[in-house]
């Protein structure tokens, strides 16, 4: 998935809490350094993920515990396990038509009802496995490091002024645009696909759902309907890669 929504939520939280004394000229000229690597510890990534997840949950419509969506996701979650590299995970459903899902470094896993409406349990398992892969393989951490590479966001993160302030809409838009354009590379997407395949095999789950989920997404792409895989390698190629792995492993 794209880091867009996650990083935008994170950046906005940082900006609104600590930029009151930032020089606007410096902010507008920071574009040349927009994608410099910014060093973050695992603890910092987790803390920032906590903020971003809380912000997104606050803006979303969450499915209640009694919802059939939540009950279904809980069943799926029990099959996938309760941690990513030792980090405990928690699952929630966003009631929205988007075909999307994401995972954060703090174990925050969110699935949109639109994706659940479109896919079988096996396919949802595969998609979640893919998102877990982005966390386990360090892609999420790298994405945050890139997004936090701007002088503007770096200053916001380091600010200790303590006085709540805000930037103008144009300034927020300038920084937000840099954050919104952050996304995983095709190589990272392919690595996450293989992670999901291996995870499903390890958990005794048939990986065919990974291939069929891509085939469904290929139909969305043909109809030009936006989905979580807009920036990923072609879905047909990804489906074939999974079927090739299944054939090599003797799985029908």
Where are these regions (language model features)?
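A Zn2+-metalloprotease active-site environment signal
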Residues: 2-7, 17-252
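A glycine-rich, hydrophobic loop/mini-helix early in the fold
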Residues: 10
């Amino acid at each position: 998935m794209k880091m867009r929504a996650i990083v935008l939520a994170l950046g906005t939280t940082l900006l609104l809490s600590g930029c009151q004394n930032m020089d606007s000229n410096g902010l507008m000229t920071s574009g040349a350094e927009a994608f410099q690597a910014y060093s973050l510890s695992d603890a910092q990534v987790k803390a920032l993920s906590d903020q971003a997840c809380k912000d997104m949950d606050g803006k979303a419509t969450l499915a209640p515990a009694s919802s059939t969506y939540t009950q279904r996701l809980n069943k799926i979650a029990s099959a996938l396990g309760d941690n990513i590299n030792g980090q405990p995970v928690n699952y929630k459903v966003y009631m929205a038509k988007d075909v999307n899902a994401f995972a954060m470094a703090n174990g925050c896993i969110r699935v949109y009802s639109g994706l659940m409406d479109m896919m079988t349990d096996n396919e949802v398992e595969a998609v979640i496995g893919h998102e877990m892969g982005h966390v386990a393989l360090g892609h999420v951490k790298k994405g945050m490091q890139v997004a936090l590479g701007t002088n503007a966001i770096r200053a916001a993160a380091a600010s200790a002024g303590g006085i709540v302030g805000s930037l103008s809409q144009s300034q927020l838009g300038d920084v937000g645009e840099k954050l919104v354009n952050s996304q995983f590379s095709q190589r990272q997407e392919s690595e996450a696909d293989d992670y999901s395949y291996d995870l499903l095999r390890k958990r005794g789950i048939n990986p065919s759902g990974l291939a069929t989920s891509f085939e469904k997404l290929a139909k969305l792409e043909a109809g030009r309907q936006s989905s979580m895989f807009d920036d990923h390698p072609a879905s047909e190629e990804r489906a074939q890669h999974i079927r090739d792995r299944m054939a090599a492993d003797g799985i029908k």
